[in-house]
């Protein structure tokens, strides 16, 4: 069958069902937007691929009511942190570093930053959670359906897709289209988004396998075991990796190849050889599940939209897996855009609001690509300290590594250099600020004219709360009827929120008038003694950066978009004016 079927109409067409596409479909369905998601594949991802799930992403899952379901499928933080460098899994250990906030000195930073926790949730487990709930909440999800082309006009987008089950093409008419179709995005290519950087910097091999490795890792639980041996510096990440998928019997190993020679022939014998080499024991029973190749990329889009087409995820930020930023950034792209789309489609905001997606997320795309690629540069000093760059002879490399055990002055210098190099990987594994410190500047943020004090500590390593417009609303624990409630739980869920102290009761009436006049949902929370919400720990007073009668206006994506230092005559009008500005209502 080749004839085109009747045109299908929807409000938003999402191309791709990976982390960005699945999150967009779920968020839009949750907000009541008519949404259709298409994927050329038969199902969600079959391979684990991305896995590190940071607190910002878990906050999105919490907002959607899915945090507990995600935690039930994930490996918790306590099984993630003993990051090991070794000559093979059964061989000599060269050093360890505590990662993902598990070091006692960093644990408090993570606990103070968010009500959620870091976890390891492989992509093949997270995607079905999001897609299943998207469908339950009303989204139309179609697999075996490949995006072919699109045309835009003043009122919408017409996309042609191919149904591979029926072998026919048909058109979908949408008011907006989201391109979340991965690093080889057809949507990005067709609308011609400008890209910077390069693809195919180096080549990598993934081998997913099953093996009971409890004996070797149960006492040093980690997500990543980095294997340094002759040949590990060729291609890939510059180092071999054994990655936990499910503790402690399912794994993914990464090995590089010379991209100039093209992808290798990955038969089962070759895959088994790679796995056993990294394990260091060819007698360990191994079941090869799948193999694949991929390339390290260093590319991002400088503009994320074209008229009614918005792109996100790997389509617009393409980078290596270092720092675990890929799926996290993709899901947060969706969290930024989807409330804006829902407000525009429901007549609560002007279409100009949608341009702020680009203003706010394009800098993030650039940041994560640059950080992930910069982190690759943190591994060569480890190899250099081991003397692996001093020779091309594999036997000499082994002797250089073995020198660590000697008691000579040269060996002492080598041990010090190795420890310093391993400690230098903090920006790879504990870059809490990269994950959490986004600050937005756009037409959907109303600055208050006060000078920005900047960050007190390293903004890549450490998270910092802020009450300034453009910052995420700070998480602290307040109480309702004696039970702890996060300030984040007072916000989000597709609605605007206003937070104030005990002297902020005038904001209640002002918010009602503003919300009614603009047709939006706006919740008001007064926090203080004798109120339904109390600040018994005093933390809200410490982080809000406003007076007791002031207010923080929080967008549906939990970012502060306006603040008033205090209530005064005319504050109600200022609130309404701020909302109109944020929503691009004229």
From Swiss-Prot:
Q: Which organism is it from?
A: Delftia acidovorans
| Disulphide-bonded residues | none
Indicate what this protein is called per its UniProt record: 2,4-dichlorophenol 6-monooxygenase
Positions annotated to bind FAD: 11-40, 304-314
Q: Which family does it belong to?
A: Belongs to the PheA/TfdB FAD monooxygenase family.
According to UniProt, this protein's pathway is:
Xenobiotic degradation; (2,4-dichlorophenoxy)acetate degradation
Q: Which UniProt keywords apply?
A: Aromatic hydrocarbons catabolism, FAD, Flavoprotein, Monooxygenase, NADP, Oxidoreductase
Gene3D superfamilies tied to this protein: 3.40.30.120, D-Amino Acid Oxidase, subunit A, domain 2, FAD/NAD(P)-binding domain
Function summary: Transforms 2,4-dichlorophenol (2,4-DCP) into 3,5-dichlorocatechol.
Listed under subunit, the entry gives:
Homotetramer.
One GO term (biological process): 2,4-dichlorophenoxyacetic acid catabolic process
Question: What is the reaction catalyzed?
Answer: 2,4-dichlorophenol + NADPH + O2 + H(+) = 3,5-dichlorocatechol + NADP(+) + H2O
Q: Which GO terms describe its molecular function?
A: 2,4-dichlorophenol 6-monooxygenase activity; FAD binding
A Pfam family of this chain: FAD_binding_3
Needed cofactors:
FAD
EC no. given is 1.14.13.20
